[in-house]
Design a protein with these regions (language model features):
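Structural motif
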Residues: 73-75, 98, 119-123, 141-143
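Conserved AMP-binding/adenylate-forming
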Residues: 28, 45-99
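AMP-dependent adenylate-forming
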Residues: 8-34, 49-60
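Conserved ATP-dependent adenylate/AMP-binding module captured primarily in the ANL superfamily
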Residues: 62-68, 100-131
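ANL superfamily adenylate-forming
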Residues: 122-153
């Protein structure tokens, strides 16, 4: 492999030590193999929905982005999985600090114009009113809360 990506590194580690624990959150433990599989499935889902690179780097100015942007509003161990999944799909993951006020998140999302938003279900209600209407994909990640998904997720 001429160039290594973070996704390729994860997959190589998963091949070498599939049952080694990668993340721990409360009682939940995820192995490298589980994480590699989860990130592959999410990356494929994003790609299947048309997310990825639309203009290659060589055709862009330094300040331009030729990839779709996905905002991540998350708070636990599945956050790195979603970052890696976005990178595998060649999508730009952008962290949105869930400690921000809804107004601050709204301003950030307006600036970013993300094509998709991945959020933990417990955070959905807090930011429902400021999520971008132009987002074509809204993914709710189960975080053990009893809250319902937002409409369209």
């Amino acid at each position: 492999m001429a160039e290594w990506t973070l996704g390729a590194v994860l997959d190589a580690i998963a091949d070498a030590v599939p049952d080694r624990v990668m993340t721990v959150s409360g009682e939940r433990r995820s192995t490298y193999a589980q994480t590699a599989e989860r990130t592959r499935r999410v990356a494929n889902f994003l790609a299947h929905n048309g997310f990825g690179v639309h203009t290659e780097r060589a055709e862009l100015q330094n300040w331009e982005c030729g990839q779709d942007v996905v905002a991540l509003i998350m708070h636990n161990d599945l956050y790195p999985d979603m970052v890696l999944a976005c990178l595998k799909a060649r999508v730009v993951p952008v962290n949105v600090n869930y400690h921000y006020t809804p107004r601050e998140v709204g301003e950030l999302l307006e600036y970013l114009s993300p094509r998709g938003v991945i959020y933990h279900r417990a955070l959905g209600a807090k930011f429902a009113d400021v999520l971008p209407g132009g987002a074509q994909l809204l993914i709710s990640v189960d975080d053990g809360s009893d809250l319902p998904e937002l409409p369209g997720a």
